[in-house]
Amino acid sequence: PEAQRQPLHPTYLARAYWHVLTSPAFLLACAGLAFNFGGFFIYVMSAPIFLMRHLGVPETGFFWLFGPAMMGLMSGSWLSGRFAGKITARQTIKRGYLIMGAATLCNVALNLALPPALPWSVLPIFVYTFGMSVAMPSLTLLSLDPFPQQRGLAASCQMFLQSGFNGLLAGVIAPLVWGSTLTLA
């Protein structure tokens, strides 16, 4: 409706962006989303080295990473949908973080105890993406809820911050940690 339209005046837009990008709750939720996704994205950026060098997988074997990861994303998303309306968003996020934390601890323990090998080196990635996908929808809503009249603008800011963090991961952090499966973990 015309009454709910936002003006495109530069001063109004600058204030609106400032309001969103200086909100501590928004920035905290965006950081959570970025770091959660970053725990998986680091493997995406390191996939050729992780799979081919560390695990000895051929060029045609990238399913070993992306198959379990996608299954984790889909099943976690399904569970998050089942949680909706039954438990609070914060409870859903807490469960997602518990799963991601367990996956991370398991990943580090496996890399300390065993040499890199399939399927053990990718199993924690399935569990991590499962937990990430459980938490992500509720965390996204928490980041957008403070701005009911400007959800699109807030979503745009959220994706801008996420993309910037992904760029940092891809260009700086991934090359620093892909030297071993333990540093990736």
What residue spans do the PLM features occupy?
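Small-residue hotspots at the loop-to-helix junctions and early N-terminal turns
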Residues: E59-G67, S156
